[in-house]
Amino acid sequence: MSEQNNNEMSFQIQRIYTKDVSFEAPNAPHVFQKDWQPEVKLDLDTASTQLADDVYEVVLRVTVTASLGEETAFLCEVQQGGIFSVGGIEGNQLAHCLGAYCPNILFPYARECITSLVSRGTFPQLNLAPVNFDALFMNYLQQQAGEGTEEHQDA
């Protein structure tokens, strides 16, 4: 009976926190004198670390770079962390939980932090669209499978 209880799936958020924040406006103040038609680039990255049995830290790194031509208007990076208890999940399900489900939870916090920093830099409001981490995770798995196939073909 206790074996069955140990295999039950469980998920709990222990903590969500800001791990690192950076905001740079290297070409201020003269960048404020230009027409605001920026090219905005969004980079996302996730990393997970096992802290204890069934306890994981997941860190979502979101970097936003806004450029006007060749000049960087601002560069904003947020590392949003979370500590999650994940029990009864292994293998691909655990990888999906840490690589997609947890980042989906963390992203709204990172987005709010970035929006606030950009606003404090007196730049026009930046609204980041929701991100489909499930699709990104599936793309990652497909890339990994493709690389594994290429390695076997080269051998």
UniProtKB/Swiss-Prot annotation:
Q: Which gene encodes it?
A: secB
What's one Pfam family here?
SecB
Coarsely, its chief localization is: cytoplasm
Does the keyword section mention Membrane? no
Query: What family is reported?
Result: Belongs to the SecB family.
Q: Which UniProt keywords apply?
A: Chaperone, Cytoplasm, Protein transport, Translocation, Transport
Q: Where in the cell is it found?
A: Cytoplasm
PANTHER family (alphabetical): PROTEIN-EXPORT PROTEIN SECB, PTHR36918
Subunit = Homotetramer, a dimer of dimers. One homotetramer interacts with 1 SecA dimer.
Which GO annotations describe the biological process of this protein? protein folding; protein tetramerization; protein transport
Query: What's the protein called, per UniProt?
Result: Protein-export protein SecB
Function text: One of the proteins required for the normal export of preproteins out of the cell cytoplasm. It is a molecular chaperone that binds to a subset of precursor proteins, maintaining them in a translocation-competent state. It also specifically binds to its receptor SecA.
On the tree of life, the source organism's domain of life is: Bacteria
Q: Which Gene3D superfamilies match?
A: SecB-like
Among HAMAP family, the record links this protein to:
SecB (MF_00821)
Q: Could you name the Gene Ontology cellular component terms for this entry?
A: cytoplasm
